[in-house]
Amino acid sequence: MMRRIAVAIVAATAAVQAAAPPDLDGWVARSMQTFNVPGLALAIVKDDAVVAAKGYGVRKLGETTPVDENTLFGIASNTKAFTATALGLLVEEHKLEWDAPVVRYLPAFAMWDPFVTRELTVRDLLVHRSGLGLGAGDLLWWPASTYNRKEIAQRLRYIQPATSFRSAYAYDNVLYLVAGEVIETVSGQTWEDFVSTRILARVGMTGSNVRHSAAAAGGNVAAPHAPIDGKVRPIAPFDSDNTNPAGGINSSARDMAKWLRVQLSGGVLPDGSRLFSAATARELMTIVTPIPVNDPPPELAPLKPNFNGYALGFGIRDYRGHKLALHTGGLPGYVSRVVLVPELKLGVAVLTNQESGAAFDSIAFRIVDHYLDVKPFDWIDGFRKVQERSDAAARDAERRASAQRDTASKPSLPLAKYAGTYRDAWYGDIVIDLANSAERGKLVMKFSHSPSLVGDLEHWQHDTFIARWRDRELRADAYVAFALNPDGSIDQVKMSAVSPATDFSFDFQDLLLKPIAANSTKH
């Protein structure tokens, strides 16, 4: 009898320890209200049990259809762990090696530096230490472009590095596209087919899919939202599939709970079979690229780490004495967070249909704190203060730029002299036209491979204009600065984002545009 009582007490204690925070629903509601999030999906796994897999809010503002456990959200860069896992499966099958050069599998692959071309490995594709700058090359696919995956990979040889090889961390997306090409070449399947059949199907993620374009197909899908001119509203989904290996998966709370379980179990599936080996599990969560440790804002003091780095598709850091494997994901209208605490067998996934990292982190860290049994911290208030300060800093930067503007200055040349075709070595051609009289003789900039990058050039000062993109959902207006030769002809054009809040994937600053002759071959 006493033994049965003891067992019952242990079981009851374990159940209490595994239970979600008692204030979870209220906390989520407060976070969503504070950060203007219409809909959210949440998955919590503890000790190989699904504690929560549920939806909150609505799929689309202005409609009443609720988010449920099966509602799909774009998980964006949380896809990277799937791509890394796919490569791990091929390593286990002896079809490739982590530390073999990429050119062994893709002989035509090349980077700017021949040394890097020769030495860059499969592992290097995943860990953000190639020497490319932050978001380098993203304009090849963001916003949606006409380049296909192979063409994007081929253009990497024209992107100059920002640092020396393996010397610094700088987040990129384009090398995950190359990883997708490696998977296709080695396996004989497209990245999409490989991940669908070899990972999603085996894990039981039957509701998920692997294409950006699928999110636009309708069904039980959360609509993307973003603040446009100060008001959150639905926006058009990102529907280009050329970057699926870096961020193309759409998933739900129900399916993400299954993914968390597999990762926390070191690759073991619920039926006892393995998706991947213990060796692959160690590879996925072992730091390769160190990341400098910086103090967080004072409002978020508990986030201070002792170590930080990037593994294979996961960031790795410590939090309150425990190792975390985590990642974020961001697309137009969707952001997400995955957090794994392997020592606690705890996993959290937060998927949202609004671009508020403050929302997903205020929820994720509240849940982690609960299972660590530490004093509650008001993450919502902390992230709110940091976000407000960041927003204010961005506005102040734009005000300072406006105050320093020389409003009396005029362009050095007649507007027609700025018109023409300009070429960047890695992006290709950009055309500047003098618009017709109906548009009052304004210059219009058009990116040849990015249909939505069409902008009216407003004179700013001297020979600098601002490209006001006609698609206002981009939120990425850019300075366009013309440099002249002594004879008054145009030597080159440089660009940069107007607002410091512009997404880093609009890597305008990496473009070096040179005028080309009218009879040059189009790029």
Locate each region found by the language model.
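Short secondary-structure junction motifs
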Residues: 37-39, 51, 97-99, 117, ...
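Residues that line or immediately flank small-molecule/substrate-binding pockets and catalytic motifs
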Residues: 9, 44, 109, 129, ...
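Active-site-proximal loop and beta-strand segments within enzyme catalytic domains
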Residues: 58-173, 180, 187-189, 197, ...
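Bacterial N-terminal signal peptides that target proteins for export
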Residues: 1-6
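An acidic site on a long C-lobe helix of protein kinase domains
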Residues: 121, 175, 252-255
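Catalytic loop of the DD-peptidase/beta-lactamase superfamily, centered on the K-T-G motif
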Residues: 19-54, 141, 184-197, 201, ...
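Hydrophobic h-region of N-terminal signal peptides that target proteins for export
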Residues: 8-18
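Generic structural signal for secondary-structure transition and capping sites
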Residues: 37, 130-134, 160-161, 204-208, ...
